[in-house]
Amino acid sequence: MIDLHCDTLADWKYANTGNPDTLDDPGRVLQLSNMPNDVHWAQFYAVFIPDEERGDAAIAYFEKNRINFYRQMEKFSDRVAPCRNAADMEKAWAENKTAAFLTIENGSALAGDITRVHTLAEQGVRAITLTWNGENELGSGHTTDHGLSEFGKEAVREMEKEGILVDVSHLNDHGFADLLEVAAKPFVATHSNARALCSHKRNLTDDMIREMVRRDCLIGLNYFVKFLRDDGEVHSLDDIYRHTMHFFELGGKKNLALGSDFDGSLLPECLNTPAKAASIYEYLISRGVSQENADGVMYKNAQEFFRKNLR
């Protein structure tokens, strides 16, 4: 199973808990200790940076969490391994370890300095969500109206050059349109759903989805109740199925993956543990989804994308 987004690593939601072992904290939804033993798991661990952290403060915030990520990679090395690409992930799985990818949620970590793209790539960052909800040096999130800045466009080009995946989750519609003019390689939406089924601006329009399919991009289904249904009343995996089928109908059978948003959002009871998330597979099969397509959503689509786009 491959999950393209969680907020488990950073301590923003659990301030002052006194537990630096964020990856195996019993107070968190996602823990190394509660991942199903019979499932090979790969996880994108995002360093979420609040919008108010800018410049040197954003760099310091990232550095604190980056150091803690690698400290935990060493402490829990019998259960988890840091990964940069598909080969690393497959090696971790062969050793019965969780495959951990370091990512960033909010391009403010660049602090407006294009040379930091290379620095972050060297530090093992594999994806950067260009914006969070508000504005940063790269552009605007879904609560604002501006698109990508000139620096944002330059950053996209540099990320592609350095092998860091460009993540458009949180980017507003204007910014998405700007990105299409700049991006030369497949990009990702690590945790976004279909706006046709849930009208929140964080979700992708049908035109966006079609364009991402055309460009061989990757999209992770988000479990947040308010991104699954307008009323937020999610009581079964039927809403995951509905979004899955909508993506399939738009040609996305090879583009759809999972992006839980564990420890960063309000989850429905049916998806509030890793074991319950793993049950998505059986549910899709029970609703008539083929084994090939269910495997694609759970891991194969992301695995193939990594093989082609992560070096």
Describe the predicted segments one by one:
Residues 223, 251-274:
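Short acidic/histidine-rich active-site segments
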